[in-house]
Amino acid sequence: MKNTTSSLRRVRLPRTPADWLEAVMNFIFFLCGMLAVCCVVLISVYMVVSGVPAIHKIGIFKFLFGTKWASTAAEPLFGILPFILSSIYGTLGATILGVPIGLLTAVFLSKAADPKLRTVVVTAIELLSGIPSVVFGLLGMQVLVPAVAKAFGKASGACLLSAIVVLSIMILPSIVSVSVTALNAVPPEYEQGSLALGATDTETWFKISIPAAKSGIAAGVVLGIGRAIGEAMAVMMVAGNSPNMPDSPFRSVTFLTTAIAKEMSYAGGLQRQALFSIALVLFVFIMLINVVLNVVLKGGNRDE
């Protein structure tokens, strides 16, 4: 009885206008948080409900591991393995190409750049992050695709390699900005101690600063991967959009995102359901990337 009475005393109704305002704002914050949760739940449920029927009709093995996609044929085939591998190879290639450039740029901006030059480079990177995807695709289609065809003697430069180059440029802002923030957060005592022991600036940056900021740098890399695997418009303009297996960097390919974008406007019946199933697979990929990001961040916090 005493516990109940004390609990009631702790729950006080607002009395002053400031208390009422605080209560109302807390309720609004709660509603906003619940709205975000509801959006995620509704999207997840919708993707599952829309994507599972086609997988059930086609067969999960034929759908995920089939190598032929002919959705408009008299006897349609719905194998998305070429799309999955193209997305993985394209994202992996963009990561391999973009991460070293982004990391070195971040080290330069954080540790070595002159303040005036740093301002110019940071401004350029911010502008790069604000360029629409269609502009990247347009520039890639007009400049990169002909250059690839000419450089390698191919009939067309619309291929996996062109998509990798465009994606590597698009993920740079995410990697650079997050990595710079992580490097700036490294305690200066770490670097001062290294320099006092006789290490050079370069040795200090690569052996002390980067390892100390590894969780933040990893977060930037994962964000870049998420950007790359979810990109559609720019990739569709430079990759060729043929449902081929990505057995060569010069092969015209289709990513998971571009498969949905190029067919959804006219799809119907099982074809439309199969496109929703592709979206479900892509959704699972994005969720896994977010899980990896959370694990990386939590691991970094424990190390700190």
Indicate residue ranges for each PLM-predicted region.
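Amphipathic cytosolic juxtamembrane alpha-helices at the membrane-cytosol interface
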Residues: 22, 101, 114-119, 187-188, ...
